[in-house]
């Protein structure tokens, strides 16, 4: 009888330990997912901020009438002619205005 009671106590401890391990695994999974999403959001925010900076520098170039502006590592080129206006960041065309 004593052996049976001792076995039940060990079984209860084992079940509690198993539940704790499962809970820890679930917590670790949730934490990993959250941290991954936070990292992804930060990367997206950095891309958005970079695009905003490019557009700000392009706006400055247009407002000042300069053909080339380089600020904070962002280089903008403005090509204007009688037919229209084009604004570039590297090889990417940001704006194109042409007369009909």
UniProtKB/Swiss-Prot annotation:
Protein name: Competence protein ComGE
Entry keyword set: Cell membrane, Membrane, Transmembrane, Transmembrane helix
Chain ranges passing through the membrane: 15-35
Induction: Part of the putative comGA-comGB-comGC-comGD-comGE-comGF-comGG operon.
Native source organism of the sequence: Streptococcus pneumoniae (strain ATCC BAA-255 / R6)
Membrane is among the record's keywords: yes
Subunit details: The transformation pili are flexible filaments, consisting mainly of the major pilin ComGC and smaller amounts of the minor pilins, including at least ComGD, ComGF and ComGG, and perhaps ComGE. Interacts with ComGD. Interacts with ComGF. Interacts with ComGG.
Topological type in the membrane: Single-pass membrane protein
Compartments, as annotated in UniProt: Cell membrane; Cell surface
């Amino acid at each position: 009888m004593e052996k049976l009671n001792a076995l039940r106590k060990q079984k209860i401890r084992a079940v509690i330990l198993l539940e704790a391990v499962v809970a820890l695994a679930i917590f670790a999974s949730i934490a990993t997912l959250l941290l991954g999403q936070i990292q992804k959001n930060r990367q997206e925010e950095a891309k958005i901020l970079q695009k905003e900076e490019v557009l700000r520098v392009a706006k400055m170039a247009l407002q000042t009438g300069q053909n080339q502006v380089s600020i904070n590592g962002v280089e903008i080129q403005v090509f204007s002619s009688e037919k229209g206006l084009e604004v570039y960041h590297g090889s990417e065309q940001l704006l194109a205005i042409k007369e009909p």
